[in-house]
């Protein structure tokens, strides 16, 4: 049976992560409070940020920026803003 968490991002009970994906106290907070679905949404935003801002994960400042964005997205309800990005419209 999958473990569930009360996801702070989705604001509902949802399937939790299988294991702690991020180190330290922040990783524990994510593991305890963020669902697998919300983590997947963050990963998509993270990829966009890394690509559009040309972040280097070997650079401490870039990793710090990304961590701040992650906390803002998952826990503070702030969306990730990427300059020039326009979401694709559905052709219904």
Swiss-Prot record:
Q: Which UniProt keywords apply?
A: Iron
The answer to whether UniProt assigns keyword Glycoprotein to this entry is no
Would the keyword Transferase turn up in this protein's UniProt record?
no
What is one term from the GO cellular component aspect held by the record? cytosol
Q: Which GO terms describe its molecular function?
A: iron ion binding
Q: Which processes are annotated in GO (biological process)?
A: cellular response to oxidative stress
The similarity comment for this entry is: Belongs to the Fe(2+)-trafficking protein family.
The UniProt function text for this chain reads: Could be a mediator in iron transactions between iron acquisition and iron-requiring processes, such as synthesis and/or repair of Fe-S clusters in biosynthetic enzymes.
Name of the protein? Probable Fe(2+)-trafficking protein
Organism per entry: Shewanella woodyi (strain ATCC 51908 / MS32)
